[in-house]
């Protein structure tokens, strides 16, 4: 199965010429970065239309990444949620089966191919759960590029397996101890590096966040998820899904799934954030549920802030959702009512992780487990035989130690 590059978008679904989704997005960056962002935007606009670039990208997605990823019917999980009023048909979009074990390689591969054509020999990236770092290190190894990954010290402790994987792949993993030593701090440090080395270095931002053109660019490299999903749904039952479900931290896996269906109003789009220890505790990462509009890492979006407008620290058992901001397009979809956003706690996510493992023999990442956990709330509200597609954004090998420590602490 081949999937063509995503078609031109309507005005409602794309950033405008200033990189804005409604009031969100934009470029709030130091003057030294403006030429680099303009160069990146121009390169992306050119190469997305270039047949040679697209041919190389599609060949690598097929032969190196292993696309298309399967759309798997979770029979026992579906039966678990069936009752008198509803027999849900739950499908998993198996991004966990991609090379490196998550959706992140779609974007890393696309951006490295862009960086090569732009003449950049040094690649930097931030990572939280480590999956974006592993994906970036993997593609840099494939193309012989220097690679530096910024990672918070708390996340390095939580994700030791991925730290070792990155180093085995030849990347330098730079610890970040500022702040709480998590994803926000790693992102800030990566941006500082980029400002200093902008002539030789390309920054592979790992989510649909940051200044324009990153939210658009990252979305486009992940849009293959939704494009494949549409084609697979048509092949399996001749129609579209009723509900799409994905976890949201920065929001790249969700946007990759949602983008193809934004203009299909009959398809519900549901994003699930991390409620951490509870929405009323202050220890959560539910940006779209509890946040206010502000600027972080170069873009206007919803943020977790205090009364003085200072960004506050986020919390989630999942390192990949532990971020106090969110991609600007998600903020836009929330404001126009096109997508719904809810949250689940650490406890609910761990339970959902174990549930999928024991019902389907699939160990999901703790990030993915947040989307799975929302089935507990969603399914009792449904009737009939709704078809639900969940983006299984990553595998859970990296989280086994975290889950073990969680149970030991109970």
From Swiss-Prot:
GO CC terms, sorted: cytoplasm
EC number: 4.2.1.20
Top-level EC class as recorded in UniProt: lyase
N6-(pyridoxal phosphate)lysine PTM sites in chain numbering: 104
Gene3D superfamilies: 3.40.50.1100
Keyword entries, A-Z: Amino-acid biosynthesis, Aromatic amino acid biosynthesis, Lyase, Pyridoxal phosphate, Tryptophan biosynthesis
Signal sequence interval, chain numbering: none
GO terms assigned for molecular function: tryptophan synthase activity
Function recorded in the entry: The beta subunit is responsible for the synthesis of L-tryptophan from indole and L-serine.
Quaternary structure and interacting proteins, as annotated: Tetramer of two alpha and two beta chains.
Name of protein: Tryptophan synthase beta chain
Organism: Thermosynechococcus vestitus (strain NIES-2133 / IAM M-273 / BP-1)
Gene: trpB
